[in-house]
Amino acid sequence: MLCTGLPGLEMQRHEIEHVLRAAAAISNETSFVLVGSQVVGLLIDSPPGELLVSAELDLYPSLHPEKADLIDGAIGALSTFHDTFGYHADGVGPETATLPSDWMQRAKIVYLGDITAICPDLHDLAVSKCAAGRPKDADFVRVLLRDHLVDLETLQQRIAKLSVTAGAASVIADWARRRATEARP
């Protein structure tokens, strides 16, 4: 079954691994930072399907982020890879996700054969979604909170560590609180 990014057609772990293998072959790199929602497919054994609706894996080579453009061109959106498999890589950079300054201290390392995936922990990933603040991010954060995969107190602490103005941090924290309220049954 192809992953199309539609509810009920979630990107599976083997598809994430496929994208990583293809990215490694294209970039001649073996270590990648993953920053998008599909990180949950590597961090949680049986994640709620609502968290896996994206058909893209946001990543960049950890040692040579500039090679993300090669990945994007070869297996990105609208590529033959995407047309064939229904999912794709989104070659991004270190600046793409707004993460706490110390996120790497908590990063989860996932070894997939010869490939290393460096993933923000779930709270740091949720913080990046709070900072982005799009409707799809609201849905994502609500599910994390609803299913007790993250907690609001830790989110608030991590938001305070963002390299943003105090005003921006306050807006992001308020946004997270609203998602927590919405997540309550």
Where are these regions (language model features)?
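Compositionally biased terminal segments of proteins
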Residues: 1-185
